[in-house]
């Protein structure tokens, strides 16, 4: 958001800190967790959620879906997924049921924080990971930020949207290659690069 000119760096930091504080409060008020389901499609995952009470939190790829919910619902979802033939159905080591309804206690506080900051229209289009669409106005960005708290992350559709929009090169900034691997699984023709240390920053700058 700061790079795109939507928020100043100081306001972006304020938003990150307040969002984290509010989410921790929601975790304390409504404990839960997340689980990875690998090898089942979205339709089957939706059925598992209806039967268990869990919710879809992130659709990483067509065959990798993250569920969130209270601990009882998640345990039930893992059992159902295993019975349905999932390659893996495992709990994740996280502190809460992120991107699900269990984060709703943080919603009013986040909305107030967003409303208090000075948002500008993006200098370049952003892509929302809830709507999987371009965000070109400050109001669209604010709506996306509000929805992200309790809505499923549509990573699979987000990457597909970027590919359909002519984006061919993907850069993962930070340590690790998890997102790069997901992009490759979504479309093997995508060009992915990692910028995770000072040397890779210099290499990118020299090729830019």
Name each region found by the language model:
Residues 1-4, 206-208:
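N-terminal entry module detector
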């Amino acid at each position: 958001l700061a790079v795109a000119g939507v928020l100043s760096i100081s306001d972006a930091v304020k938003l990150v800190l307040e969002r984290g504080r509010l989410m921790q409060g929601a975790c304390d008020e409504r404990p839960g967790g997340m689980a990875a389901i690998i090898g089942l499609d979205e339709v089957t995952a939706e059925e598992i959620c209806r039967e268990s009470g869990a919710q879809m939190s992130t659709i990483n790829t067509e065959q990798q879906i993250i569920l969130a919910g209270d601990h009882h619902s998640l345990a039930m979802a893992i059992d159902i997924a295993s019975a349905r033939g999932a390659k893996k159905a495992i709990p994740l080591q996280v502190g809460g049921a992120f991107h699900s309804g269990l984060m709703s206690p943080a919603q009013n506080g986040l909305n107030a924080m967003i409303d208090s900051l000075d948002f500008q229209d993006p200098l370049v289009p952003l892509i929302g990971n809830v709507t999987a669409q371009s965000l070109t106005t400050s109001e669209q960005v604010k709506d996306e930020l509000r929805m992200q708290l309790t809505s499923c992350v549509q990573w699979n559709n987000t990457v597909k949207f970027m590919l359909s929009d002519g984006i061919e090169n993907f850069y993962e900034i930070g340590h690790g290659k998890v997102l790069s691997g997901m992009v490759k699984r979504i479309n093997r023709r995508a060009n992915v690069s990692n910028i995770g240390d000072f040397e890779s920053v210099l290499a990118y700058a020299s090729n830019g």
